[in-house]
Amino acid sequence: MDLRGTRITVHDMTLRDGMHPKRHLMTLEQMKTIAQGLDQAGIPLIEVTHGDGLGGSSVNYGFPAHTDEEYLGAVIPLMKQAKVSALLLPGIGTVDHLKMAHELGVNTIRVATHCTEADVSEQHISYARKLGMDTVGFLMMAHMNSPEGLVQQAKLMESYGANCIYVTDSAGHLLPDTVKARISAVRDALKPETELGFHGHHNLAMGVANSIAAIEAGATRIDAAAAGLGAGAGNTPMEVLIAVCDLMGIETGVDVFKIQDVAEDLVVPIMDFPIRIDRDALTLGYAGVYGSFLLFAKRAEKKYGVPAREILVEMGRRGMVGGQEDMIEDTAITLAKASAAA
């Protein structure tokens, strides 16, 4: 398919999804430096919050180095052309968090639910629209619903007021054909003026290929992270995506070399460990398990002596979804007992 002249909006995840491998402990200085680099490279939209969205600071998800207000308050005034977005998961983030983000100057709010639970987003989406925000419905773990099922969920979010809907491959489990099937079905069902987005993870090394497949099928907003910094094996690597788009004539407005420099000079040095497809991250993609479970499973391995891979496979078998991080410990204990009894 000839995509020359196609214009997309790339949405950076480095400072939100990238909080997962950083255990939410990014410093304000790191946030500001990377955000300014992204802004200068031409990235139009940058997400900033706790990895699990506004209000994510908790025992269950992890305590960040700073509050959402502090991170947003530090980054937003520095932006020359980029707008800032925030993620909100109903049940974690509240309408009060939404108000706070709006007051600080957040442009875009992304209201995220499991891909079968769009009905819990009505309050937050409708309120964000009342505030005049760019309002996105974000359907997570999209591999766990059929194209037809996703259509119904997307239409719900659209009816609440969302002006953009995301098909979100939280587990990095989808392949180009399964991405296309979902994006095409949702694109055909939504109003022409409603935008469509895709969020990929790199657990099966498909982040870039899936993003291009999504663009072919009608997505105009694409998530990626500099150096792939994100949960699991990371998000779609932004610098690779931008280079591929440039070769294909897809217009992003992002400087090919400046975004490489942000990844190499600013993001890689702050990594606590290399973002790569190790056996556990690969298992996330293979078994279709939520990306941010990775560090929790590695932690449980150290504590209970059960390989992280076994924990993740069992989590996939049980159909666990985002937000059930507490079940990782429970699963590890169950597997350890079963192993001891064998």
UniProtKB/Swiss-Prot annotation:
| Domain of life per record | Bacteria
| Entry-linked CDD domains | DRE_TIM_HOA (cd07943)
User: Any idea which residues are catalytic in this one?
Assistant: 20 (proton acceptor)
Question: Which residue positions does UniProt flag as site: Transition state stabilizer?
Answer: 16
Q: What is the lineage of its organism?
A: Bacteria, Pseudomonadati, Pseudomonadota, Betaproteobacteria, Rhodocyclales
Q: What is this protein called?
A: 4-hydroxy-2-oxovalerate aldolase 2
Q: Does Acetylation show up as a keyword for this record? A: no
Q: Which organism is it from?
A: Azoarcus sp. (strain BH72)
Pfam families to which the protein is assigned, alphabetical: DmpG_comm, HMGL-like
Q: Where is the Pyruvate carboxyltransferase domain?
A: 8-260
